[in-house]
């Protein structure tokens, strides 16, 4: 069975008992979470979120990239969120490479020119959280005077550690 077939089978089971079709579009807890796409992270579980509680925006590293800012602006302006939580994590792949490394790999394997792309890797986990919190707080596209907090999720213990 292919992955697509497995997903379709799982969705059939999910949809057969689905009863949340009337949830409102705006998240009930008025919060957006920006975190990493790493498969070891399950933000709904480790934050105690239910369906409809929050916007969860995921990308490589949980970075406050232009696209993440775009999503946060939509979340705030059109759907009423007024808090942002940034969560990076231990043992993140973004700590393992430099832009030059990935650009070279893309050139060698795909003959793709990625010189213009910043993949946003980082060397210091806590500093990356601080940087992304600052990017969000300083973005002209996002609300001022709202709670923007940063955390590190420990993949070994499941604990959230605040970053100040």
Predicted segments, located by residue:
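Divalent metal-coordination and catalytic microenvironments
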Residues: 11, 33, 57, 86, ...
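Gly/Ser/Thr-rich loops at beta-strand to alpha-helix junctions
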Residues: 37-39, 90-94
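Ordered, amphipathic secondary-structure segments that act as subunit-interaction surfaces
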Residues: 79-92
């Amino acid at each position: 069975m292919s992955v697509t077939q497995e997903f379709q089978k799982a969705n059939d089971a999910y949809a057969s008992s689905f009863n949340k079709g009337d949830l409102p579009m705006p998240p009930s807890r008025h919060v957006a979470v920006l975190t990493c796409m790493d498969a070891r992270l399950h933000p709904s579980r480790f934050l105690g979120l239910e369906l409809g509680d929050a916007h969860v925006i995921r990308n490589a590293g949980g970075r406050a990239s232009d696209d993440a800012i775009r999503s946060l602006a939509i979340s705030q302006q059109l759907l009423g969120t007024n808090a942002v939580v940034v969560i990076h994590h231990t043992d993140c792949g973004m700590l393992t490479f430099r832009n030059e490394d990935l650009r070279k790999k893309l050139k060698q394997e795909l003959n793709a020119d990625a010189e213009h792309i910043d993949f946003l890797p980082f060397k210091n986990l806590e500093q990356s959280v601080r940087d992304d919190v600052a990017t969000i707080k300083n973005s002209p596209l996002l609300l001022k005077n709202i709670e923007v907090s940063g955390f590190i999720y420990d993949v070994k213990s499941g604990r959230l550690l605040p970053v100040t």
